Each structure stands twice: as C-alpha cells, then as structure tokens.
Swiss-Prot record:
It is a multi-pass membrane protein. One of its GO terms (molecular function) is monoatomic cation transmembrane transporter activity. Pfam families: Asp-Al_Ex, TrkA_C. HAMAP family: YidE. Disulfide bonds: none annotated. This is Putative transport protein CKO_00031. Its main location: membrane. InterPro entries: AAE_transporter, RCK_C, RCK_C_sf, Transpt_YidE_put, YidE_YbjL.
Length: 553
C-alpha cells in the first residue's frame, strides 16, 4: 500500500474511532467532535508501535486545509449577526466574555514565567484548557514562523490533549458551582428571562396606537417624521371596521388605529407623538389582508434597497420585518436585500404573491450551494492571513494566519451577503457538513502526531503537571467572571451559563446549559451573542502570547 493510501486509511480509522468516542455520553455530556482528537491519539500510539510511515506532507496539508474549512464556515454562519451582536444589546455580555479571555491569557503568562514551561507546551495547554481548536492551529503556525523545530511544535498538540478534558469538565463544574453558591431556582430564572424579553428588551416589538394628536389629523403618513423614518414601520391601519395597508400617501385621521413595528424605545417615542397605546387587535383574520413570510432567492434583487423596489407603491404591500440569519430587524427603506433574507409581508393575497415572485421565494434554492463563492472566500481569506503586520520590537511580523484570515474574510463576506450574482449564503446543512469535515480532519492529524509519545508523557513525563496548569487556566477566569457577573451585574443564571459556554466556544457546554431548562432560549441566545467575537480573540491570543514570550525570552 502506498504512503498516500495508507495515510487516508489511517485518517478514516481515526475519524471512526474518534466520532464513536465523541458519541459516548455521561449524564448527557460527551466530548462530541473533540473525541476525534483522542481517537487520533489512540490510533497514533499503535501506528508508532507498528513502525508505520505516513505521508508527512499529506498530513500537513490535511491539517491546515481542515482548519481553514472549519473557521471559514464558522465565519459564514455567524457573519450576518456578528456586527449586530456588538451593539448595545450584547455589549455587556461581550465585555464579560472578553474579560474571560484576558484573564485566561494573564494566567497563562504567569504560569509560563513561574514554572518555565516551554513555549509550545504552554500554548497547547492554553488552547486545550479553553477547548478552542483554531487557537491550537494559530499557535502552531506562529511557532513555525518563529523558527521553532517541528518536534517542539508537535508538543503543542500533545499538551492540548492533556488539558482538553478538564477544559470541557471545568465549564460544567463552574455552572454547577454558580448554581450551588447562589442557590439558583432554574424555573424562576427562566421566568425572569421571559419577563425581561416581554418588558421591552427584545430587539423588535409591535404596538397598536390610536391617533389622538389633533395636529396629525388629515396628514399623510409621509409627512409625519416619526412614521416616515427608518426606525418605525406602519404595516396596518384600521379605520372604523376597515383594515388596510397604508402607503406613504395615506391620509391619517383622528381615531385611526396604527400597527407599528420597531425597537421599544422608538415605539415609545412614536406613542408620545401620535396618541394612546390600545389593546385593540389589528389581526388580519376575517379581512382581505394576510401576513406571510417569503424568502429572498432572486439574484436580480440582491443588493437592492427596499425603497428602490417600490413594494408599497406598486403592490400595496408592506415589509414589516426582515429576518437575517435569525436576527429580527426593522425593514428600513435603506436596507439592502441579501440571499436568504426572510421578509414579513402584509397585504392582499394576490399582491403578496406578486411580491413573492419578485423576490424569488424559491425554497429549493436555499438547499443549493454555490461553490464558486466558497473558494473565492477561502482564497481571499488565506491571502488576508498572509499579510504581515510589522510591530516595532517584535521578532517577527504578526499575521492573522490560516486560522484568522479565513475567519475574518468569512465574517466580512457573510455580512456583505452578495456581490452581483455571487452570494455567500450557505444552507445550514451544507455549512455544518463542511465545518464538521474540517474539524475532523484537523483533529485527526493533531491526534496522530501526538499519539506516539502521549502515554509516556502522561505516565513518565510532565503530563500530570500539564493537566494541573490547564485546570488553573480553565477554572480561574470562569469562576472569577461568573462571580462578578452574578454579584455585581445581577446576570440571569441561564444567560450566564450561555455566556460562559460561548466564552469557551464549547458546544458540549451549550448543550448542558440548554438542558438546564427545557423551553428557555436564554443560554443559546447569550452563547450566540458572544461566540463570534470570542472565536476571533481566541485565535489572536495565542499568537500574541507566542510573540510576547518569544521576545521576552
């Protein structure tokens, strides 16, 4: 059997063994995709014992390409909502998550100086303790750029594997510890979260207002500044018993009921100007109007602003909301449409059908993958990651690398959405498949390279001390920030658990947090809010640590 055939066969065996290990769960918690790392260690041990020779060039390519696939698909997935997560609504959560990353870096630096831990080893411990695989890849690349011998670079994978198990267990123990210390009632926390959302902290809400301001009588909607802004959408108007879709030229009269959509603060401002909020229903049931959601799939409308499509004037249809990558937005007239956007339409059935034809609404297109944008994005990401940034006093130029470059490019392209007929939307199933394939390939190679010396290091070398260092790097930031967030910020427990899981980019921890309450989405929401920024910081941190330690050492 040739080297290439043997290498592919061994990698397939690693994936099978590793995924089987990852599916083993204790009380609903397992290693998940991280099991591939331990499958690689097990198989790598026996490959080394048998004296098999694998293709080192092929292993290197597979490791790097797997990492690129993984970080690129993550960026495409979270890109549309990344910049929205940095708004004020998620600012507090992101600040606490950033604090966890900073404290983890400081603990790593202190351990490195006190115990003189070799640079590759301490970076591997850091990456494993925070359960972040792209950090491992970024650290290995910067070490190679610094001229570190390959044998030492491979040590990083071994120390990563030593610290990884407690990295997963540590976050779960922290959640349990917070629950015990503060005697948390999970049901009460879930109810508090729901009450917070209903009291105006969700992004988009609706309000029915009766026109009582005499100054607005017989004015056109377009002449009322609060109604002609991009912050408020008036999607329905009820006069006596007649429900209609208002256009910019619609004349409003005293006593009219307006159904407005917008953010809570903007709705409150509109209510102060227009009149009194009422409980009267403006439902389309029993009328000739209906509400329907359609999806943007027509390439001809991609990148066009809503105002330029003239849906109100041509079809008497209002877009009341726009959902982009799971984030509800006000459908402002300046918003540009992207592939996969979901539009909430209000109008007559025939008019809605006409608008649906204009925007596409072809569900089958959502399952198709454009491969050209994928490789354009990967190529641009690799180029971005290769651009050197020279910092005075640093021994080498900083680079985003093969982990950071594709991630940043994917975030940007995911936010842009489309350029001409190229769109970077990727069906969730396809995104997940490429992401899982990438991380399996990367971890399989890391495990194989670490497996030969893993047992000896654990039983006869420094393996146990590495595990101890990892426990400090995992536990100190999580417990410190967990206490601060709960005591001083009065953070909801379920939200706190999601934020802690997101700060470690740890899906098994998110699964555990979600299982704390069957119906609450608090943990998933906070996890998604901090995940994109934390992933970026986790990739950059080991590079900064490596350059600083190298310069100081």
């Amino acid at each position: 059997m040739s080297d290439i055939a043997l290498t592919v066969s061994v990698l397939a065996l690693v994936a099978v063994v590793g995924l089987w290990i990852g599916n083993i769960k204790v009380r609903g918690v397992g290693f998940g995709i991280g099991g591939v790392l331990f499958g690689g260690i097990i198989v790598g041990h026996f490959v080394d014992q048998a004296g098999m020779t694998l293709s080192s060039d092929m292993l290197h390519f597979i490791q790097e390409f797997g990492l690129i696939l993984f970080v690129y698909t993550i960026g495409i997935q979270v890109g549309p909502g990344f910049f929205a997560s940095l708004r004020v609504s998620g600012l507090r959560l992101n600040l606490f998550a950033i604090l966890i990353v900073i404290i983890g870096g400081l603990v790593t630096a202190i351990l490195h100086k006190i115990f003189a831990i070799p640079l590759p080893v301490v970076l591997g411990i850091f990456s494993g303790a925070v359960t972040n695989t792209p950090a491992l890849g970024a650290g290995q690349q910067i070490l190679r750029d610094l001229g570190t011998p390959m044998e030492a670079v491979d040590q990083m994978g071994m120390s990563y594997a030593m610290a990884y198990p407690f990295g997963i267990c540590g976050i779960l123990l922290t959640m349990w510890l917070m629950r015990m210390i503060f005697r948390v009632n999970v049901e009460a926390e879930a109810k508090q979260h729901e009450d917070t959302l209903s009291n105006g902290h969700s992004l988009i809400q609706t309000m029915n207002i009766r026109v009582e301001n005499p100054n607005l009588n017989n004015m056109a909607i377009q002449d009322v500044p609060i109604l002609n802004s991009d912050k408020i959408i008036c999607s329905r108007l009820k006069r006596d018993e007649t429900l209609m879709v208002p256009s910019p030229g619609t004349i409003i009269q005293s006593g009219d009921l307006l159904h407005l959509v917008g953010q809570p603060v903007d709705l409150h401002n509109a209510q102060l100007v227009i009149g009194q909020e009422v409980d009267t229903s403006l439902s389309t049931r029993g009328t000739d109007l209906r509400v329907e959601r359609v999806v943007v799939t027509n390439e001809k409308v991609l990148g066009k602003r809503i105002r330029d499509l003239h849906f109100k004037e041509r079809y008497d249809v209002v877009i009341s909301r726009l959902n982009r990558a799971g984030v509800e937005l006000v459908a402002s007239s300046d918003a540009s449409l992207q592939f996969g956007d979901i539009l909430n339409l209000v109008g007559r059935p025939s008019s809605i059908d006409a608008v649906a034809n204009v925007v596409g609404n072809a569900q089958q297109k959502l399952q198709q993958v454009q491969m050209l944008p994928v490789f354009i994005g990967i190529g641009l990401g690799v180029l971005l990651g290769s651009i050197p940034l020279f910092v005075p006093g640093f021994p080498v130029a900083l680079k985003l690398g093969l982990a950071g470059g594709p991630l940043i490019m994917a975030l940007i392209l995911g936010r842009i959405g489309s350029i001409g007929k190229l769109y970077w939307f990727m069906p969730p199933s396809a995104n997940l498949a490429l992401r899982e394939l990438g991380i399996v390939l990367f971890l399989a190679v890391v495990g194989l390279k670490s497996g030969g010396d893993f047992i000896d290091t654990l039983t006869q070398g420094d393996g146990l001390s590495w595990i101890g260092y990892g426990i400090f790097i995992t536990a100190i930031p999580l417990i410190t920030v967990g206490l601060l967030a709960r005591i001083f910020a009065k953070m909801n427990y379920l939200t706190l658990c999601g934020m802690l899981a997101g700060s470690m980019t740890d899906p098994p921890a998110l699964a555990f947090a979600n299982n704390l309450h069957a119906t609450s989405g608090a943990a998933a929401l906070s996890y998604a809010t901090v995940y994109p920024l934390v992933m970026f910081l986790r990739i950059i941190t080991p590079q900064l640590l490596a350059v600083l330690f190298w310069g100081l050492g």
